[in-house]
Amino acid sequence: MKAVIQRVSSAQVAVHGELVGQIGRGIMVLLGVEKGDSEAAADWLAEKIVGLRIFEDEAGKMNRALTDIGGAVLAVSQFTLAGNCDKGRRPSFDTAAPADEGKRLYDHFVGALKRQGVPVQTGIFQADMQVALVNDGPVTFILERR
């Protein structure tokens, strides 16, 4: 399971021009689910993301977590994170989880975030989405867990 996380001032996701999720200050998560991923990996990622101290304190040091600043999460599924571009010019998605398994684990991840006590907004699984965000910093991390 791969997550690209970005510290944001704001973020939103729309489907067919209709806004389906938006947050102010917080973390934007793009989540890719691969074959062999587990609920334990989803739980670990959710806990890590909520507790990661990537927000600045009064001294300007990254020392505050999402819960410390009262932030929210915008979680968007992105199966292309499972893409492999090593051969040829077209990405291969052979390692991506099948849609039903991907949705189950994405939903589990969203539930795990909510159980951490933070507000969560989402996109729509398998939809063609338009994502807009203001990356604060910029601050971006890639997290992986199997």
Swiss-Prot record:
Enzyme class: hydrolase
GO cellular component: cytoplasm
Domain of life: Bacteria
Residues spanned by motif Gly-cisPro motif, important for rejection of L-amino acids: 137-138
InterPro entries noted in UniProt: Daa-tRNA_deacyls_DTD, DTD-like_sf
GO process annotations (BP): D-amino acid catabolic process
Keyword field contains tRNA-binding: yes
GO molecular function: D-tyrosyl-tRNA(Tyr) deacylase activity; Gly-tRNA(Ala) deacylase activity; Ser(Gly)-tRNA(Ala) hydrolase activity; tRNA binding
UniProt-listed Enzyme Commission number(s): 3.1.1.96
CDD domains: Dtyr_deacylase
SUPFAM superfamilies assigned: DTD-like (SSF69500)
Alphabetical keyword list: Cytoplasm, Hydrolase, RNA-binding, tRNA-binding
Subcellular location: Cytoplasm
The protein's assembly and partners: Homodimer.
Protein function: An aminoacyl-tRNA editing enzyme that deacylates mischarged D-aminoacyl-tRNAs. Also deacylates mischarged glycyl-tRNA(Ala), protecting cells against glycine mischarging by AlaRS. Acts via tRNA-based rather than protein-based catalysis; rejects L-amino acids rather than detecting D-amino acids in the active site. By recycling D-aminoacyl-tRNA to D-amino acids and free tRNA molecules, this enzyme counteracts the toxicity associated with the formation of D-aminoacyl-tRNA entities in vivo and helps enforce protein L-homochirality.
NCBIfam families: D-aminoacyl-tRNA deacylase
Protein name: D-aminoacyl-tRNA deacylase
Gene responsible for this protein: dtd
